[in-house]
Amino acid sequence: HGISRMYVRYFDVVADAGGRAVPNATLNFATAMPQDVDIVPTVFVMPECLRGDRKQLASLIVKRVLQMNETNDVNDVKEIQIDCDWTLSTRRPYNDFMQAMLDECHSRQLQLSSTIRLHQLAQTPPPADRGVLMMYNTGDATDIRCHKPILDLHDAAPYLPYLKDYKLSLSAAYPVFTW
């Protein structure tokens, strides 16, 4: 299929009962990763996890990703991606966290990318080497009246003018599945 790069969700970071950020739903490497494909470990961070020490969180995430790579023979990783559904109210702590992630990644010769949702295009971009615009989930998949919940260009169109002046290099992620 000509796939040269795979974004692989390694784990989520969620708040435990005490409000501490902890890893959850860690990937179980049942088979080896393909050796001829660039693997980009991706970590989903819940916004409420950004209330604590963001530098420590960044350090722990990078260390966990690197340990998972080593344990599972995932070699030559050049980039880590952070996925977070941040909003205007969580933008500042997210950007602080992303700056800590950027510093941590660069100290280890890694690049950092961030997912960018359509609604986030209207905000200042987070600190990152690049972004990946998520061109999917534009509708409500639980609403039977929504005919194109995965990608409806009509729903995406209001956000597209923000691309012209967006200050972060972006590539686009499109859905590659049907139902």
Regions found by a protein language model. Name each.
Residues 5, 55, 63, 78, ...:
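Context-gated lysine
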Residues 12-133:
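Chitinase-like catalytic core of GlcNAc-active glycosidases
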Residues 3, 11, 87, 136, ...:
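Residue-level marker of positions within ordered structural domains that often coincide
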